């Protein structure tokens, strides 16, 4: 930031607004590149709750890096300052609904310092994707999110443990009016935190999640909103918490925002060679 200091007021006035915007973007990218912590997630296979075919064959997941924690309110504030087109009041209506960042005092002021380390919410898919791209990443695919979220502190796949599943389900008993805590919960075996128990999270391919109703119910499948080729296996009751996430995501449009929906980013890693 010494460049801005040395320029002085007169020098800043001579700069074009476009150059200043570009400079802010560069500062944001350089700052986040060094400060944000990502954890490496090794390659493996995933038996997803999404039945991709009749046999529900395991999915191959290549190695990637995932943000250790969800994006915070403070980090999102820094992003919209550097990218004014994503500020509340400036963002195109196509990219955000009326609830976008409504919890902030102004388009660039959180209004409460306590919000800073809490997960960013009330953010659309479009804004979340733009943030990740500015950070050199992208939103995770559903398979990447589910793969990382299957792990506990010691196991890469803890989904067969009833006690672990019960702990996750306990999150749903928390009153909706309870203020969200700061990010930084216990890490799983990969070093990733807060995949459960804090907020729902956007995924890149949220609109490719297909909700398939339980054949034992009277639900009309035409009343369910879906697109894509995946189908949720609603018979898999032990993964109820994950199914709830898919049901929520499949009901959303990319411009939607809610007070319980946040996001985190992933980055590609070089493919390992034998």
Regions found by a protein language model. Give the residues of each.
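Bacterial N-terminal signal peptides that target proteins for export
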Residues: 3-21
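Bacterial N-terminal signal peptides
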Residues: 20-30
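Disulfide-stabilized, aromatic/cysteine-rich ligand-recognition loop
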Residues: 35-37, 62, 118-119, 123-125, ...
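Short, solvent-exposed loop/turn elements at domain surfaces
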Residues: 47-55, 73-78, 87-88, 234-240, ...
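Cytochrome P450 core scaffold surrounding the K-helix E-X-X-R motif
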Residues: 50-51, 206-214
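Active-site microenvironments of metalloenzymes and redox enzymes
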Residues: 63-164, 267-271
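Short, well-ordered junction/capping motifs at the entry into regular secondary structure
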Residues: 169-196
């Amino acid at each position: 930031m010494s460049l801005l200091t040395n320029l002085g007021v007169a020098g800043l006035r001579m700069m074009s607004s476009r150059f200043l915007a570009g400079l802010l973007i560069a500062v944001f990218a350089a700052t986040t590149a060094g400060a944000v912590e990502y954890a490496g997630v090794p390659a493996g296979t995933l038996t997803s709750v999404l039945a991709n075919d009749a046999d529900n064959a395991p999915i191959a997941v290549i190695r990637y890096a995932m943000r250790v924690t969800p994006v915070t309110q403070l980090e999102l504030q820094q992003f919209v300052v550097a990218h004014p087109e994503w500020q509340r009041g400036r963002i195109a209506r196509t990219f955000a609904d009326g609830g976008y960042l409504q919890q902030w005092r102004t388009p660039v002021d959180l209004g409460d310092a306590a919000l800073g380390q809490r997960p960013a919410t009330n953010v659309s898919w479009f804004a979340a994707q733009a943030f990740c791209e500015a950070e050199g990443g992208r939103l995770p695919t559903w398979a990447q999110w589910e793969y990382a979220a299957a792990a506990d502190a010691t196991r890469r796949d803890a989904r067969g443990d009833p006690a672990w599943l019960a702990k996750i389900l306990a999150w749903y008993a928390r009153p909706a009016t309870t203020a969200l805590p700061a990010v930084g919960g216990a890490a799983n075996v990969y070093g990733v935190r807060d995949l459960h128990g804090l907020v729902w999270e956007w995924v890149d391919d949220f609109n490719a999640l297909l909700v398939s109703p339980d054949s034992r119910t009277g639900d009309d499948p035409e009343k369910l909103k879906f697109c894509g080729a995946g189908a949720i296996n609603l018979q898999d009751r032990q993964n109820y918490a994950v199914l709830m996430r898919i049901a929520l995501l499949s009901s959303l449009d990319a411009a939607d925002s809610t007070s319980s929906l946040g996001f985190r980013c992933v980055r590609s890693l070089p493919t390992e060679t034998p």
